[in-house]
Amino acid sequence: MKNTKLIVKTKSKTYPIYFGNNILNKTGWLIKKNLPNVKKICIISDNKLPKLLLKKLIKSLKKYELKIYKLSASERTKSFKVANKIIEQLLNDNFNKSDCVIAMGGGVLGDLSAFISNLTKRGLKFINIPTTLLAQADASIGGKTGINSSQGKNLIGTYYQPDFILSDVSILKSLPQREIISGYGEILKHSIILDRKFFLWLFKNGKKIINEKNNIFLKKAIIKSCKIKCKVVNKDEKEKNLRMILNFGHTFAHGFEGAKNFSKKLNHGEAVLLGMMIASELSNKKKKLSLKDLLLIKKHYLNLKLPMFITKTFKKNEVKKIIYFMKKDKKNIDEKINLILLNKIGKTTLPKEFSLKSDEIRNFLNSYFL
């Protein structure tokens, strides 16, 4: 499989994303090429990754002074306590602004590592090596850093772009089916909001991605997904306007995750898939999305057995908790819950165009349990 490079151009930084098969062992060479002044490297790695992956990375970095942390990739890890502990140790080890933090894991460790990089001495170098489909296709791009609060997900954070991203597609072969489905949710989101042609390609080839983990189709879907997100981020790095459309399905998703206490009962990608289905049905109810397009989306969900029924995951008495976390969402305006809805496959409503009172959303969610 041919290696590919995509350039991200934001106002604050221009940086490359490297895609390929078995390219993890090129990390050291890429650091030398892109960041020649690095001497010390802190690796923050998912403790459940195959040991061989970390060994490969360490072997490629043998010329550098290494500090290694293996962390649990749970939402509870994204905390001030964990971030502060690592920052204090980096300061104790005299990490300088020219030194580097590498995240090796999914979106959770990417968010946390970028947060740590940004706050330590007002900015260390940062490299992201995403090891999940969700992170390769979405979470690693865009510069959002974050930790969680008891009030909700990612309510504390900054924007801090990486110096480069390395996406080794061959790593995804080891992922369980649930993780592939989770990542597919973000790929599908990018097609639904901005690219009908890509959606129709996924409609035709989704099973090759999810069931077969076909390397060629996986790479094509990841790169296309990244190109769509990059196009948006390049225009609106700090989510002042256009970038908000990337939150399609996410306001519901954050409510769903919160209602399950951000536990592994419902992971982020599953919550996004469920949130997109609810947002699509609400779009149809509000006469934004045609029944024809809604049925096409539903057919794709059914074909791939994607999470789509709120009643299979929640009970009616959990709706109140869902609304509580939706009201905490960063995108809300005044007392209303701001939503991105669909006009058609490939086009959303405008950011800040559509907001509803929490009572109306509560009634809409309750209607599923009648």
Predicted segments — roles?
Residues 14, 288-370:
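C-terminal charged capping/lid subdomain of soluble metabolic enzymes
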Residues 73-74, 104-106, 248-249:
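Glycine-rich beta-strand-to-loop/alpha-helix junction loops that act as flexible
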